[in-house]
Each structure stands twice: as structure tokens, then as C-alpha cells.
Swiss-Prot record:
Alphabetical keyword list: Cell inner membrane, Cell membrane, Hydrolase, Lipid degradation, Lipid metabolism, Magnesium, Membrane, Metal-binding, Phospholipid degradation, Phospholipid metabolism, Transmembrane, Transmembrane helix
TM region(s), chain numbering: 10-28, 35-51, 92-116, 137-157
PANTHER family cross-referenced by the UniProt entry: PHOSPHATIDYLGLYCEROPHOSPHATASE A
Function: Lipid phosphatase which dephosphorylates phosphatidylglycerophosphate (PGP) to phosphatidylglycerol (PG).
UniProt xrefs under InterPro entries: PgpA (IPR026037), PgpA-like_sf (IPR036681), YutG/PgpA (IPR007686)
Subcellular location: Cell inner membrane
Designated name of the protein: Phosphatidylglycerophosphatase A
EC nos: 3.1.3.27
Record's GO cellular component terms: plasma membrane
Pfam families linked: PgpA
């Protein structure tokens, strides 16, 4: 019975698996993607406040590249494509949106989190297409990047209308 549970095939002692499941946040149920996004938001706010936007964006790009490998390796180890517990892609997606908000006020942080989750769950075109067609680490990562881009567009629209 345990052989059918993909979570039994990973170890939090393995740094690849630990990062892929968002330091364990992707193991929280229900809604592991939401828990992963929340953990990513908290980490992202801390890093953004310490690094500044430019360095944070470079860090985020590196996290995307690393995530392609982490997600590919962990899905291969689990034997399941894009298992819900893999939330590194949520971390990167919410990092992108956090980099676009004008301030680290609780309102903007909440907006970044909520908008990212909305588009990540809804998966408007072409997000769903990439989510379904690209069955590799890049595919796991890119749908969240696209969801983040949708969220960033809304953040910019809100900023424009607030002026």
C-alpha cells in the first residue's frame, strides 16, 4: 500500500526534495498549493526587504532555473507528474508578483498572494495549455510564471488607476 503513495518515495533529508516541497509547506493539507504560496510569500517578503528589488529579481530568476531541475527530479523520484506537494513553482510565482508591488505594506502583500493564487487556480489561456502539455520540470515551473505575469498585470493596473 505504501508503494502507491508517491510521498513515501521522497525524503525531507534530501535537499532537492526539501526545496521542491517548499521546506515542507507543500505537505500541508488541504490545499498544498495555497500553503506553499503562503510560505513563499513570507520568505519572499523577508528576502525582498533584505535584498532589494534588483537582487531579488536575479535571485528569483535563479530560483526558476533551479526549480526546473528540482521539479523534474522530484517528479521522477515520486513517479507522478506535478504532484500537489511540489510547490517550488508557487514560491517562484509569488516571488515574481512580490517584486512588482509598489510597497511591502500588508495590503499589497495580501494582493500579491491573492492575485497569484487566483490565476494559478483559474489557469486562463495559455496557462492551462502549458500545464497540460509540458510534462517536465520546465512545464511545472512555467505555468506558475504565467500566472504570476497575469497577477503582475493586475497589480500594474491597480497602481495606474490609483494615481
Amino acid at each position: 500500500m505504501t508503494e502507491n503513495n508517491p510521498l513515501k518515495k521522497i525524503s525531507l533529508l534530501n535537499p532537492i526534495h526539501l526545496l521542491a516541497v517548499g521546506f515542507g509547506s507543500g505537505l500541508i493539507h488541504p490545499a498544498p498549493g495555497t500553503w506553499g504560496s503562503l510560505a513563499g510569500t513570507i520568505l519572499g517578503v523577508i528576502l525582498l526587504s533584505l535584498l532589494g528589488v534588483k537582487i531579488f529579481l536575479i535571485f528569483t530568476a535563479l530560483c526558476f532555473l533551479l526549480g526546473c531541475y528540482l521539479c523534474q527530479k522530484t517528479t521522477a523520484d515520486m513517479g507522478v507528474h506535478d504532484h500537489g506537494s511540489i510547490v517550488w513553482d508557487e514560491f517562484v510565482g509569488v516571488f515574481i508578483v512580490l517584486a512588482a508591488i509598489p510597497s511591502l505594506s500588508w495590503q499589497w502583500i495580501l494582493a500579491a498572494f491573492a492575485l497569484f493564487r487566483f490565476f494559478d487556480i483559474l489557469k486562463p489561456f495559455p496557462i492551462r495549455y502549458f500545464d497540460e502539455k509540458l510534462e517536465n520540470g520546465f512545464g511545472i515551473m512555467i505555468d506558475d510564471v504565467l500566472a504570476a505575469i497575469y497577477a503582475v498585470i493586475v497589480v500594474f493596473a491597480i497602481q495606474y488607476w490609483m494615481l
